[in-house]
Amino acid sequence: GTEANGFQANFNGNGHTITNLRINTNQKFFGLFGKINGADIKNVGLVNCNVNNTGTGWDHAYIGTLVASTEGGTLENCFSTGIVNGSVCVGGLIGATHQTTTTNCYSECNVTGVENVGGLIGNPDGAGNHVVNCFASGTVKGNKNVGGLLGSISSEVVNCYASGAVSGNESVGGLVGSGWSSYAIKNSHSTGSVNGKLYTGGLVGWRGNASITSNCYASGNVIGEKYT
């Protein structure tokens, strides 16, 4: 699906995998599925991906292996391995989600971006998002809003974890880089090392207002310069 015409059907991979997916672009909304609108994607794996966006800024945003961006729908029992490089809203599996439930998914991708960069999802944005029973294990590098699982959130996260090393400059967290208003993190943890400069945390880098965190922990080494 494109930005103007998102994919609206349902896709069931029936447990199959796609190997050696290669994407090299300087455009926005790129992944196996560019954009989905209310679609259900389930039971598919992507192995040894190499997704690379050479552009910079929001004009080149939304990059993931499986899905670039969602508006509604569900993702269930999906995974990816490989390498992802992008600019804004970059994720090991999904670039960004809106009003979407992501369940039983994981990514082992090494992810590099600039802003809103996550090991699984770059930016699950909005109260209608739910991320449940998911994990990420790859390294994550970026500049701002960088998280081992999720880059920047205003959503619900339940029973999730991240184990990869995370590094960045501002709002850097082992699980979540930046948490905005009305988000909740429950029964989740991170174990990877975290290295940042401004707003750095083992679990969450920058915590916004109206947040709820319960039954969570972080065990990785944390290095920061200010607000750590």
For each feature predicted by the language model, list its residue ranges.
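Surface-exposed repetitive/solenoidal architectures
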Residues: 1-228
